[in-house]
């Protein structure tokens, strides 16, 4: 390929809308073009990267016996209603684009394909003799993001690989889960990425167990917690840890203390001299359920701990046996709108009576009450007195109506003790999720009535797994992990081109002829090579080559009359002056050795 034919347009200035480095570099390098909020065109260079990632994914999945297919992007609403996910994905802040056709039938643009593939499997897979089967596709998906940002990291249209496996028993599901874990590790190594596999929450997909693959980068939206010995790693949404003991509070006679205007933990500690771990923080929240059912929740947690919203959603969902769309913190304005003027926000105790909800316009009239494990073992604590400007001191659970249901709803934090070794303190890193694997169990097969005939001749639901890789996100995540002040540094395995031949001066016949010769020889050797044959200044060509991140440069310049070229490695900046033949030989060896090492690491 010739740069003169590439439609390459690069920018020197940082685009105003690009917040993180990878987004900036992809726009500046002409890899992507924003069409509208959260929607991007993949330009020729980016499409080459996408195709190389896709090829790696296909090779590794095919080697595991997976079968490639292509599923429809438009899904009938009936399937999603049957699984119970339609309302959660379309109502309020739901992420599914949905529409009605000319006959008035509801359809959704698929963000994921569990419902569709399960129905298809039910028709094609009749017997245990046909199992296991693992089907995958690579195609465009859609999410109606509330706030699209960071380029391809959180877009409304994206390319994804999703796979779905069907099994006769749980043991076989777990075996496939481990096989897919192995395939993912190989895929990411071949893509030149450093990833961390972490325990994760299954979210709206559901299932018993799941694992995320994170590219560690400062721009990552997720916080991951790891032990230094690498034996524990989890997304903070899922992470558990051993928490520090509270500061002991004397067991004195319970009393009421005046705390005028002291609504927060900090205000209470600053004015009364308490430690946050001695205070019971009581929070009123609202769970938004399907069909806009609104359920108040009263949560008690130790004052030095943070509430984990994902864990709380899971706890509420398990308690009610219903899907929870979202959790909202209650504000004074919301209380006013419900005509609940008597609830003393900032001074609430764990024994706040349900009768406070009697006047609620459209909330359920009874609290769900949870206590985090950190608060459950407090023998003496401070808490709100359910009266404005008053707290209770030196009380225990028997004095405040008894202990509510105990659940783990706290955030594990950096510095906490790891659960597997008291010598290991958790450290934090930011991560970009590029892959996620799930053990779905029988969640979808049961609700969609998808079954097979087992060895005993009886019908039973499939055991299922699902496995996703964000192809377009992975491409940008690679940039976030591989760049310098000059531009992108693509790993060789997914670079749009492996080598760029730069003719410094196209007006110089010797430089041009040597450059063309190098280009032809490299093409003949099977190298993915680009030649910069533009009539531009050499400095412009060098800057563009660094910006777009081609791993190797061969420069035909001033010494071309003697057959000398410059060989430059993008990642290190190391430059060598060599005879053209020697440069090609060394380059071929470097490319071959790199590919061998990557393949060896992934074995």
UniProtKB/Swiss-Prot annotation:
PANTHER family: MITOCHONDRIAL RIBOSOME PROTEIN L39/PROLYL-TRNA LIGASE FAMILY MEMBER (PTHR42753), PROLINE--TRNA LIGASE (PTHR42753:SF2). This is Proline--tRNA ligase. The keyword ATP-binding applies. GO terms for biological process: prolyl-tRNA aminoacylation. Belongs to the class-II aminoacyl-tRNA synthetase family. ProS type 1 subfamily. It is found in: Cytoplasm. GO terms for molecular function: aminoacyl-tRNA deacylase activity; ATP binding; proline-tRNA ligase activity. Consists of three domains: the N-terminal catalytic domain, the editing domain and the C-terminal anticodon-binding domain. Coiled coil: none annotated. InterPro entries: aa-tRNA-synt_IIb, aa-tRNA-synth_II, aa-tRNA-synth_II/BPL/LPL, Anticodon-bd, Anticodon-bd_dom_sf, Pro-tRNA-ligase_IIa, Pro-tRNA-synth_IIa_bac-type, Pro-tRNA-Synthase_IIa_type1. Catalyzes the attachment of proline to tRNA(Pro) in a two-step reaction: proline is first activated by ATP to form Pro-AMP and then transferred to the acceptor end of tRNA(Pro). As ProRS can inadvertently accommodate and process non-cognate amino acids such as alanine and cysteine, to avoid such errors it has two additional distinct editing activities against alanine. One activity is designated as 'pretransfer' editing and involves the tRNA(Pro)-independent hydrolysis of activated Ala-AMP. Homodimer. The keyword S-adenosyl-L-methionine does not apply. NCBIfam families: PRK09194.1, proS_fam_II. It comes from the Bacteria. Keywords: Aminoacyl-tRNA synthetase, ATP-binding, Cytoplasm, Ligase, Nucleotide-binding, Protein biosynthesis. It catalyses: tRNA(Pro) + L-proline + ATP = L-prolyl-tRNA(Pro) + AMP + diphosphate. Its EC number is 6.1.1.15. It comes from Prochlorococcus marinus (strain SARG / CCMP1375 / SS120). GO terms for cellular component: cytosol.
């Amino acid at each position: 390929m010739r740069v003169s034919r590439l439609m390459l347009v690069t920018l020197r200035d940082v685009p105003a809308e690009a917040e993180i480095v990878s987004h900036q570099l992809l726009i500046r390098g002409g890899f992507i073009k924003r069409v509208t909020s959260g929607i991007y065109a993949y330009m020729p260079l980016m499409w080459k990267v996408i195709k190389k990632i896709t090829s790696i994914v296909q090779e590794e999945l095919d080697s595991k016996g997976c079968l490639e297919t292509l599923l429809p992007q438009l899904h009938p609403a009936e399937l999603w209603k049957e699984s119970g996910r339609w309302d959660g994905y379309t109502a309020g802040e739901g992420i599914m684009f949905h529409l009605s056709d000319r006959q008035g039938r509801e359809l959704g643009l698929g963000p994921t394909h569990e419902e569709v593939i399960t129905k298809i499997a039910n028709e094609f897979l009749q017997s245990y003799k046909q199992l296991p089967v693992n089907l995958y596709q690579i195609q465009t998906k859609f999410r109606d993001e509330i706030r699209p940002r960071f380029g391809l990291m959180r877009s409304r249209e994206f390319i994804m690989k999703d796979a779905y496996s069907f099994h006769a028993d749980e043991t076989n599901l777990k075996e496939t889960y481990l096989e897919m874990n192995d395939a993912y590790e190989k895929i990411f190594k071949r893509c030149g990425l450093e990833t961390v596999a972490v325990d994760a929450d299954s979210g709206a997909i559901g299932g018993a167990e799941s694992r995320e693959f994170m590219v560690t980068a400062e721009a990552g939206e997720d916080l991951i917690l790891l032990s230094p010995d690498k034996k524990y790693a989890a997304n903070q949404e899922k992470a558990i840890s051993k928490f520090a003991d509270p500061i002991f509070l004397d067991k004195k006679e319970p009393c009421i203390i005046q705390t005028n205007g002291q609504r927060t933990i900090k205000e209470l500690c600053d004015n009364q001299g308490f430690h946050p771990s001695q205070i019971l923080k009581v929070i009123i929240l609202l769970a938004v359920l399907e069909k806009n059912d609104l359920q108040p929740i009263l949560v008690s947690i130790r004052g030095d701990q943070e509430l984990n919203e994902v864990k709380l959603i899971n706890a509420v969902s398990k308690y009610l046996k219903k899907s929870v769309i979202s959790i909202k913190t209650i504000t004074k304005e919301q209380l006013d709108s419900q005509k609940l003027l008597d609830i003393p926000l900032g001074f609430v105790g764990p024994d706040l009576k349900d009768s406070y909800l009697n006047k609620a316009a459209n909330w359920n009239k009874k609290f769900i009450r949870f206590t985090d494990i950190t608060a459950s073992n407090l023998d003496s604590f401070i808490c709100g007195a359910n009266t404005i400007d008053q707290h209770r001191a030196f009380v225990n659970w028997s004095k405040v109506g008894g202990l509510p249901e105990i659940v783990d709803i706290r955030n594990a934090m950096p510095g906490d003790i790891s659960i597997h070794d008291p010598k290991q303190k958790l450290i934090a890193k930011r991560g970009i999720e590029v892959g996620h694997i799930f053990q779905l169990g029988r969640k979808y097969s049961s609700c969609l009535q998808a079954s097979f005939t087992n060895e005993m001749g009886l019908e039973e639901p499939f055991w299922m797994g699902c496995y996703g890789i964000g192809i377009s996100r992975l491409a940008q995540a690679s940039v976030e992990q591989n760049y310098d002040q000059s531009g992108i540094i693509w790993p060789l395995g997914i670079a749009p081109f492996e080598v760029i031949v730069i003719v410094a001066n196209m007006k110089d016949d010797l430089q041009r002829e040597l450059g063309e010769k190098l280009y032809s020889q490299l093409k003949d050797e099977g190298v993915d090579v680009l030649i910069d044959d533009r009539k531009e200044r050499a400095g412009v060509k060098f800057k563009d080559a660094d910006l777009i991140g081609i791993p190797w440069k061969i420069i035909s310049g001033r010494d071309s009359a003697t057959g000398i070229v410059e060989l430059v490695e993008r990642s290190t900046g190391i430059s060598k002056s060599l005879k053209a033949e020697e440069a090609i030989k060394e380059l071929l060896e470097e490319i071959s050795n790199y590919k061998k090492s990557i393949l060896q690491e992934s074995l």
